[in-house]
UniProtKB/Swiss-Prot annotation:
Family: In the central section; belongs to the AAA ATPase family.
Gene name as annotated: ftsH2
Molecular functions per Gene Ontology: ATP binding; ATP hydrolysis activity; ATP-dependent peptidase activity; metalloendopeptidase activity; zinc ion binding
Compartments where located: Cell membrane
Originating species: Thermoanaerobacter sp. (strain X514)
Name used for this protein in its record: ATP-dependent zinc metalloprotease FtsH 2
BP GO annotations: protein catabolic process; proteolysis
Amino acid sequence: MKKNLHIIILALSIFINLLFIYIFISEVKPNLNLNLSFILTAAVIVVTYLLFKNKFSELMPVNYNNITETKEDTSHRKTNITFKDVAGLDEVIDELKVIIDFMTNTEKYNKMGAKIPKGILFYGPPGTGKTLLATALAGETNSTFISASGSEFVEKYVGVGASRIRALFAKAKKSAPSIIFIDEIDAVGTKRNTDNNSEKDQTLNQLLVEMDGFNSNEGIIVIGATNRIDMLDEALLRPGRFDRTIHIGAPNMKARLEILKVHTRNKPLDESVSLSELARKTHGMTGAHLAAMCNEAAILAVMKNKSKIGKEEFEEALERVIAGLKKKNPSVLEKERNIAAYHEAGHALIGKILNVNTIEKISIVPRGEALGYVLNFPKEDAFLLTKTELKNKITMLLGGRASEEIIFNEISTGAENDLKEATKIAYQMVCNYGMSELGNRVFDLHMLKSTEIVDKEIDKIINSCYILAKKILLENKHKVIAIAEKLLEKESITKEELETLWEEENTLCV
């Protein structure tokens, strides 16, 4: 309808302009030179075209095949990566070994009337190994690995995305046995709604049709990966399409150790390096983070002309990954340096007294956008946190600002990220965990007419934690000063140095 309207408007525009020229020539300038009248007519047509150039391009017929060939960027290859290259995901690998057995010993499953799953969906945070697992499965089954990104199928022209989906599955059937891997599948598989986006809906519909259209004995498996499973259309998740839905989470300590072994097996390590210690210090880090850390440590060793990678390089690499690049010549004012020292001292002291985490290092060496940081890690991997533990985390986060207020009788902008994280935890306590005076219930802010009651509860939690932080710091002000002065002197304090300083201050108090 829209295109027809554009055609009518363009035709009328040209007709009116030509009519105007005709009247001008016949009535106003009847003796006008014929060549000049021709030039005027041509000029009007050219100007009209230039004014409506974009509309003309939209009205031109689209060659879907050419678009598919030029824009589609799928990889189509055999891979040498196997499960030996995957670490820390033993449970997932065991699940995938069933798929391998299915593909290599089809007959015994056919006798039992069992069908191989058509699709597997990996979901979880970025960097946890979803792409690596898909590639390894292709390597283990000697299948052709065909990968694509969900965004490759999202286009302006209606029908292009669907055309690419058809081409992808046609390629897979031609190359069978094959594995189709669609990364960020949420870009193409988002829930359908009332919005008028026919291209997006057609693309998703075509994907659904293709997944229904091939038989499990054709040797094709579709693997999708996403970190937003909540956004996927229900039709995509139903059995018969994605039969297996597997969560790939951040690795625990044992898994991190296995991942570190894989990423250091071809690297010369010094005797000072303890992979177990590194696994303990890297709580919350994904496989991608660990790979980046190991690579960074190797680069640092080369830059220092060392023959082996030592503990020092790994510690520096860990800080780079977590806190950012160290600034060699920071233009930090002395006043800002003092504020940063007392700010970090406040965090560290409350963290130690409330036993929030193990304090590994305190530093006022600027990294990234931060003037200082406290490197701290949990003593063990925990799946559950109590209300007290969450409030202690908030109190530690607010310790930096509380320390500034006590020492300088003033607060700075340095607590921005601390406040964001503290508010996030308090929000989760109120809305997700039922840990407020509102009782054992959850809240969806999108469904509430007013968020005032939730905001009040968040304020109560943060204010009570801030009062506790100030109380602890006032009672241990001498220790805050001692830690800050040591930071101003040395710029960084290790775990061992903090313990020594703590004991000295305790002795002085006695």
